[in-house]
């Protein structure tokens, strides 16, 4: 894939990340196949729930300490769920994610048939990237 397209798709994922109501981290994902965006997602609460993604678990230096609620859906899982509800197939597609996937999202990416992953920011746990690489999925960190 041409670098110009990679950057355009990654910038688009960043724009969708801005739609997240989370206070700790905004993550966006888009799925692309045959140079078309076939699905999008960003992290947030399930449809119909309130948009408060975190609980305040304490304060440090007067600032709230936030913990993400377990109900929050990751951007990748939202994009893959939307893809599953559509007439499109993920087989042979690419996913562009603002942040490297966690292990659970990496497993969903693999199971959905996505063949390449592009991400911009690292995640605290590399298990997701390691799983994807072991599974034969092309993984690329972009700037």
Name these PLM-found stretches.
Residues 1-143:
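Zinc-dependent deaminase catalytic domain
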């Amino acid at each position: 894939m041409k670098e110009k397209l990679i950057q355009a798709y990654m910038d688009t994922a960043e724009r969708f990340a801005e739609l997240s109501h989370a206070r700790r981290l905004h993550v966006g994902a888009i799925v692309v196949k045959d140079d078309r965006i076939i699905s999008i997602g960003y992290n947030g609460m399930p449809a119909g729930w309130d948009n408060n993604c975190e609980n305040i678990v304490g304060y440090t230096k007067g600032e709230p300490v936030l913990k993400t609620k377990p109900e929050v859906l990751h951007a990748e899982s939202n994009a893959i769920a939307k893809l599953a509800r559509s007439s499109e197939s993920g087989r042979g597609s690419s996913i562009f994610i603002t942040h490297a996937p966690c292990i659970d999202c990496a497993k969903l990416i693999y199971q959905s048939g996505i063949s390449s992953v592009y991400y911009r920011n690292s995640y605290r746990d590399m298990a997701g990237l390691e799983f994807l690489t072991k599974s034969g999925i092309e993984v690329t960190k972009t700037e």
